[in-house]
Amino acid sequence: MTKKIKAYVKLQIKAGSANPSPPIGPALGQQGVNIIEFCKSFNAKTNKIDKDTPIPVIISVYNDRTFSFITKTPPTAFFLKQAANIKSGSDNPKNKKIGKISIFKINEIAKKKSPDMTGSTLNSISKSIIGTAKSMGLSIED
């Protein structure tokens, strides 16, 4: 018999850096999850990833207070900032460009993001990434 899901909790946590402090502690504590157990599991699963990488995680909390979780690939904006070597996006992306990114780099990012975007072609993922890049104030080079 399958367990009944009580709630889903979506968080974004730096790889290998989960600890019981906010925002993790309060979000999981409300659901009655063993926070320390989650932190140990998450850190073990993400210990091979660079420590500054934000990892989206979806935690399924069951009625018996157990949990399971899946990790996703880092956000597109994280990959774009890394590729363009910038700290943050432009405050006025339409008029103020803060960097450039090549189509080659966009295709590399699309390949990294493809496991999370099931049912999408590499071309459509690339178009989505180009839209994100433009909204951050990056110009696209051929």
From Swiss-Prot:
GO process terms (BP): translation
Gene3D superfamilies on file: Ribosomal protein L11, C-terminal domain, Ribosomal protein L11/L12, N-terminal domain
Any one GO MF annotation of this record: structural constituent of ribosome
SMART domains tied to this protein: RL11 (SM00649)
Pfam families: Ribosomal_L11 (PF00298), Ribosomal_L11_N (PF03946)
Modified how: One or more lysine residues are methylated.
Keyword RNA-binding: yes
Keyword field: Methylation, Ribonucleoprotein, Ribosomal protein, RNA-binding, rRNA-binding
Record's GO cellular component terms: cytosolic large ribosomal subunit
Family: Belongs to the universal ribosomal protein uL11 family.
Role played: Forms part of the ribosomal stalk which helps the ribosome interact with GTP-bound translation factors.
Entries under NCBIfam families matching the protein: L11_bact
Quaternary structure (record): Part of the ribosomal stalk of the 50S ribosomal subunit. Interacts with L10 and the large rRNA to form the base of the stalk. L10 forms an elongated spine to which L12 dimers bind in a sequential fashion forming a multimeric L10(L12)X complex.
Name by which UniProt lists this protein: Large ribosomal subunit protein uL11
Species name: Wigglesworthia glossinidia brevipalpis
Record lineage: Bacteria, Pseudomonadati, Pseudomonadota, Gammaproteobacteria, Enterobacterales
